[in-house]
Structures are given as C-alpha cells and as structure tokens.
C-alpha cells in the first residue's frame, strides 16, 4: 500500500521524507537529527548516523524505543582533499538510517531495505549489486532464497570491507551493502566494486551480533542490533540521474549562486574550475550547520575545522575570480535550501552570516599576502617548498599549512612537512624558554620524584582545618628531609584541607603549622593528583613524617567558592540570553574575580549584559540549594550535565547541580546555596581571539566593594560637576557638545593662523617643466593644521603643484609629521602621494600612506628631517626633469 502513495520520488526532500515515512509505518520512532557537536566530550563531531545511538548500542543508555529511524546531519573532514575531485566525497552529508535495539534482525533489515529501494524508490533489480561478509552464510541465504536475487549479483568481501566494529573490542558484526550499477549492460562477469564510475554504494546494513574481547574472541551478544545508513546525497544522484552528487537539488542551487557571482558558467567551465564550484557547494552546507550548532571559528578543535573550511571557500572564490566578499550570499542560499528540514538555520540566520562575514574579511588579507609569496616560489621553478618557508607562511602571514600543501600540490610542488614541524617545535621551545620561571616548574628531582607519592586526599570540602602527615619536602625542586626558617619549599601531604589549583579555580592559601613551627602557604597546585603546598617557613623546622595541621584562609575560600558557583550561573544565563550553543573555552576562578571565556561570533550587547546580570541575580535571590553528588559519567551525561570538550573525565564524576538552573561536571569548591553569593556584577566583556569572547565578573564581597567604589565616584563627580547623580548623564553630554564646538573653533583659528602665516610660501615654489615644487619645514603645527596649510598651498599653486611639508609639532614629544599634496596634473603623470610619503617617512623611521593626491605620515627620528626633505625635493626634481610636457 505504501508504494502506491508516492508515484515518483525525485527531490532530496522527497527522498528523505519517503525514507522516514516508510520506516515510521513499520513502527520505527522518528528521531530528530542530533547536533553536529556531540554530547560526548571525547568526540569532536558527529561523523555517522549511528553516533547519537552509540550509548544505546554499548548498553550505556536506555533505548528511545525498540525501533528508530532518523536523518542525521554528519561532518567528516578526513577526505577533504577529495571534495569536489570525486563524484561523491563530502564534508557535510545527511545519513538516513533505521535502527533496531534488540528487536528485529537480519531478515527484516534485508527485506525492508529491498522493499524500500525497489518499491518506494523504484530502482530496478538489474541495477543493484549486493556485497556481504564472506563468512555470513545467513545473509547470503536471505538474499538468494527470500529476496530472490541472482547469486551472480552477490559479491563476497573480507573483514576489511564488510565487517563493522566499534573498536578493537566491543560490539561488532558483519554488514551487507547495496550498490547501484550505472552500467548494467557491461554484465556480471567482471564486477569490480572499486570501479567508482560504474558502482556507487548507497545503503549499508550492519548486523551487530558479536562482542569481541581483548583476545580477539567473538561471542554472541544477548541482544542483537541493526544499524543502517543510506547517504541522502548518493540516493539523490541515482534518482535524479546526475553524474555526481553536486549537481543534485541538494547542492546545485548553491553552485548556481556562485556561478552567477563569478560570471562563469558552471557547465561550460573546465574541470579545475568545476572543482572550485563543488567545494563551495559542499563547504557552504558544512559551515552553516557548524555555526548553527554553536561552533565558532578558532585555532582549536571544531573551531579550527570551521575556520579551515571557510578559508578554503575564500581561496576557491578567488580562483573563480571573485574579488568581493561573497560567502554570505551563497550561505543564504544554503540556509534557504535546508531551513524547512532544519529550522535552527532560519532561527540562527543572523548569527551564521555574521560569523561567516567576520572570518571572510579577516582571511582575505592573509590570503593575499600569502598567495603573493607562494606565487614567487612557484614562478621560481622550485619543486620543493622548504620547511622554513612553509613555516614563514604560517607564522608570519597566518597561512595554514594545509592551504600551502593544497596550492603547492596543484602546481606539482612538494612541501617539506618534517622541516615545517622542526621549525614549529623550535618555536615552541623558544616560547617555552622565554616564559620559563622557577615558580613550581616540574624540573630536576621534582619531575622524577613526584610519581613516588600517593594521591593526596582532599578533605577540605566542608572542613577548613585538619591533621595531615608530611610525605615529602621539595627545596629548589629537589627532595630534602627537612625545611628550615626562611626557606621556600613545596610540601607534599597525605591529605589536605587546601584546594589545589585546577579546573580554572586558584588554590587556597593559609598556614601549615605544628606546635612550634609555621609555613605561610601562598599557593597550592595539583600535579599528577599530588598537591604541592608552596610557601615560606616563617619559623621552626619541618621534617618528613611529621604530623602537622593545615589551616585554610576561610575568607579567601569563601570568595573563590562564590565566584565558582557564579561562573556556573553565568554560563547558564549566557545560554539562555545569548545563544543556547554557548560553551566554555576557558575560565579563571580567583578570590577577587571570575573570568569566563566562551564561543561567540560578535560582542555581547549592553542589553544582553543587563539581562544576563539580572538573570543571575534572580537565581541568587531565589536561594537555590546546590546539590553535589558523585555518579557514573554516563549517568551524569544522560541527566544533561555539561562536560567541557577535551577535558579528561574518569568513569566516576562529580556533578554540581543547581536544580532547574545549572548542572555541570566539576571538581571545584562551591557555596551551599545561591544566596551566599550576595550579588553578581559583570565588569567587562571583550574579544580575546577570533570567535572567543571573555567576560570578567564579580560576586559576593568583591561585587559589594565594586558598587561602593562606584557610588563614591558618582558622588565625587556630582560635587565636581554640580549636578545630582540622576543629572550626570545629561551634564556630561552637554559638556562634551560644548567641548566639540570649542575644539572646532580652535581648529578654525589654527587653520586661519596657518593660512596667513604660510600662504606667502607659494612664492618660494620652484618651477620644473611647468610644475611647481614646494618642499618646506613648518614646525609647531598639529596634523590637521599642517594638512590645511598643504591644501591651501596646493590650491594657490594650481593643478600642476607638488607640495611636501614636514615638521615637528611639539619639540618635547620628538615626533615628526609629513604631508604630501599633489595637483590633478601631477597625479595624471604618474606621481602618487601615498607612495611618495612612505619613502620620505621611512628615512625618519616612520610610515604612512594615503590617496594618489594626498597623504600623511608620522615618524620618530627628528634628526633626519632635513635629509628627508632634501631627498623629497631631489626626487621630485628628477621625476619632473624626465617629463616632457606635450
């Protein structure tokens, strides 16, 4: 009956909808696509349709239902160099899948797959080839006896091609793949599935039936699972009868837009040009989904993948002759193309286009500089780009190594990757040496001996003083038996009430004491689970094995705990107010403030800042209790606890929960309830790198101190300006307006003085080939006045004038100013004010630039002013002497 509902399926949307409808009618629950950013912090991106179900297959999470079906967006970049080159490699793709969790198995999976492709998609059996694992007799029997497929259409392959596993150990099983034959007339005598022109694999059925142990032994799983995947783009190519995936309706509208912008016809262009179009089509889909799912361009992890894709797009746009910014235009087409199936694209439209524009503008300048240097290397005939030169491109010009390799490869030139890595390592060593210090660096004996100590037990969650035994003493990074008065040492204890610096939170300070000795502890760090208590022995002697008492400074612990809880609340508020995809990129929890770094493509607005503050303060007033529990990591993640990507967690994790507000994996110290924070205030918001913003904020006593100081300043300003606090804004506004007007009047007077004082200078101009040259030193004028004087002199001398003025505005500052002003006729004969002034300023250790008819510059070496002006005059004379006025 289902087959009669759809007469002809052609479009990508129809293919997707038909797949989901088909399996829904077979009692599969339709699961929406998961984010490209997985919940699992150990995985960078969603690379397969089954990834969201991996915890279910591994028995770590309850199944959403016995049967499920989905259209999952995925990204893979391992074959990025093949994108656009082959007919079907992509970074972004959609994987249609049907899944069984301990319900049906091979028979139903094979039967339904066959019904779908032959009855719903109406593929002819004459165009289908099936591969199976060579030991999977059960699948072979089903295909031949129940489906009725010709045995000649079955290809048996080995474990490499037709046996799936999740790793060296764990669930695994054989698979059966369906291939489409574009040339069935060639017959079945020689079937080579590696022939990409003839065959395309479009549906993979994985039968998870075994568990592999560490010895490689296979045992049957108690519950057998089905995991299938059909590439939407590949099925579109087949049903739309296209020669490649890029010309299907899923991607081609983006290519058409790029074709229109570049004024190049896609179909009549050569293969190399088509590759650039295809890369734009593919990468556009990837970047819009990455940004919509919360990824911001950066130099790390997912952010670097996004940046790399965007930079490839800019470059291939340039190869198509597109000189202007264009990525937002083609991204808009991609969003429009997919927003019905992925509404988040429409909701995040502004964010996506903004992020793309920022990155495009930034990279265009980099690309221009790097390409120029690469062009010089290529034109020189070299066949190898040295590691030094590749590193120079990377370090000086910001040119990614992958892009250098790509451009070099297009010109049959190799890159010395090992040499590049050596240069990179050398730079890291230089940076390390430059920033080295003696403050608790793990060097000498400490590096070797730290592993000898057992893990330090932290007992300071609720108790700020406790007894402990000294396990070791480090003096100048070497183990010693005792510590004496005046020595700075690092003490290792068996247990401690001091919190050791980790997770962004600073360590506690306080004292370690015995009956007759005391250490002032000013820093505690954690190295390999061993706490190092760093401090100076105030008096007495401490020895290894001695029992002592640890006493934490309670005031500073309270402040740090308040700031840590405030950091959790801040992240939740940012997710609610700014973007649900906000994620932590770094943090600092200190005694006096907190700092939170997060992904964002643009600054947080003042209105958003106010809303974030208001939300956090409302949670503080509501007196939410904090619930801290240890639990299995999988349980914590299932409950929605936030985990920081890249952070290593054990199987057991500590969860800090503010019910209904925030839940994070965290090992830091916190308050008992939110009201202990008192209040919360954001004091700054700024960008610290591409795609990363930083907020600094205060809570508790620090926030109260901040408000008190601000109140004092407001009162002082009120007295100074003779205005009530509520009138300060208007009063300052009026003063600014008055100041602007006064400055305009002053500048006008300066210009008039300069005009009357220097207007007679035009009479000293030298005539060369009918052009008037005036080069002079004028001191005591600021930039605006010097500019005004030059323009007035040019006006007096006419279209054939060349005026260069230089001078010292203020002798105390020892700085120079230069201006060059050229008449229209001087510009017509090829003279350029911007180039002239750059040459002049460089003589005096300066620089500048400007337009062909006017430019200005600054410089530092006032002793060379006379020489620079003489050079300028001689240069102009020679230029004009060689000119013949026709």
From Swiss-Prot:
Residues annotated as transmembrane: none
SMART domains: tRNA_SAD (SM00863)
An example Gene Ontology biological process: alanyl-tRNA aminoacylation
A GO CC term assigned to this protein in UniProt: cytosol
Cofactors: Zn(2+)
Function, as annotated: Catalyzes the attachment of alanine to tRNA(Ala) in a two-step reaction: alanine is first activated by ATP to form Ala-AMP and then transferred to the acceptor end of tRNA(Ala). Also edits incorrectly charged Ser-tRNA(Ala) and Gly-tRNA(Ala) via its editing domain.
Note on domains (UniProt): Consists of three domains; the N-terminal catalytic domain, the editing domain and the C-terminal C-Ala domain. The editing domain removes incorrectly charged amino acids, while the C-Ala domain, along with tRNA(Ala), serves as a bridge to cooperatively bring together the editing and aminoacylation centers thus stimulating deacylation of misacylated tRNAs.
Protein name: Alanine--tRNA ligase
Organism: Prochlorococcus marinus (strain MIT 9215)
Classification of source organism: Bacteria, Bacillati, Cyanobacteriota, Cyanophyceae, Synechococcales
Gene symbol of the encoding locus: alaS
